[in-house]
Amino acid sequence: MHHEPATWRRVLDLLAPCEPVVVYLFGSRAHGRSRQDSDMDLAVLPGRSLQPMAWFDLQGRLGEELGVDVDLVNLAEASAVLRKEILAGGKVVWARDLQQRAEWEMYALSDYARLNEERAPVLAALGQPLAGHAR
């Protein structure tokens, strides 16, 4: 599947119920390492919350429309670690407002930094380094 403008217009049309603030492509498709059977990993920061079943339905509709399995992540509900991984390795495919995007990314990264500070004593007691830090 190609990531052409028409593809992203279809994605955005389908995501309209959650009023996306920013949409990221992550995983193998974000880095040109996908195979024919690779799924599409999308992360969305919604401007409007949806019930979990609505997210599930949205994921299914995206998969049907795009002809690939879609893994749809709601960034408002994702863990600090997953959000950081998406920011570190994902690509922004659409943003409604650059200021909102920048503010959210700063929040997500500071939340991850706070998590690392909070878990550092526990990991040190267990003799494990923080992810991304050498011993």
Could you describe each region identified by the protein language model?
Residues 1-24, 31-35, 47-135:
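Catalytic core of pol beta-like nucleotidyltransferases
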Residues 43-45:
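Short hydrophobic/aromatic beta-strand micro-patches
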